[in-house]
Amino acid sequence: MTLALRHLVERRGWRGPVVRTVSTTRMIDRLAQRYHLPVYETPVGFNYIADYMLKEDVLIGGEESGGISIRGHIPEGDGILMGLLLIEIIAVSGSSLADLVDDIHSQVGPAFYQRNDLRLVRPVAKEQMKQHLLDSAPADIAGETVVQISTIDGVKYILADDSWLLIRPSGTEPVLRVYAEGRTPEMVKAMMNYGERVAASVT
C-alpha cells in the first residue's frame, strides 16, 4: 500500500486523504506526512474504510491483509486491483519489486512486522480486556517510551520511534491477535514477547 500511495501521488498527481486500519503499517503515515496528506485510522475491517470512501474523496484505503481500494474504484478491498497497480508501478518505474521495496524502506522505513494469534480457551470480554491493558499500560516497551495509546480497536501502544504493539480480539475467530511493527527485527521480537505475555494474562 505504501508503494501504491507513492505512485498515485508522484506519478498520477493525486491528492486526498489516506485511510488505513489500526493494524496496517505506519510507513503509510510517514509517507503521507511528506506529502501533507491526512491519514485516518480505522478499526480492522474494510467496511470501516468504505465508510470514509463513501463520505470523502479518499485517495487510497487499505488494510493489513492486503485489500486496498483507490479513488474511482469500488469501496471494497480488491486484491486484483493491487496486483494490477503493482504491475503498473513496476512498468512505469522500470525497477524490480525488490528494488522498489528497498527504496521505499530507505525513504520511510525500515519496518519489520509480525502477528501472532493466541487461541482462546474462553471468550474475552472486550471492554474488560481493554481496561486491563490501559490500567497496566507500560511507560516503555523494549527501551522505547510509550508516547500514545489508541483504543480504536483493542489497545495499541505507539512508541517514540514510531514502533507499535497492538493487542485485539479477533472479530471472526476465538483468538486474541498480537501485532508488532518495529525498526529492527530485534525490536519486533521484544515487543511480541511483551505483548504475548500481557495478552496471556487476559485470556
Please name every model-derived segment.
Residues 10, 14-179, 185-203:
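Phosphate-binding and adjacent anionic-ligand microenvironments
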Residues 1-11:
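Cysteine protease catalytic core and zymogen-processing segment of caspase-like enzymes
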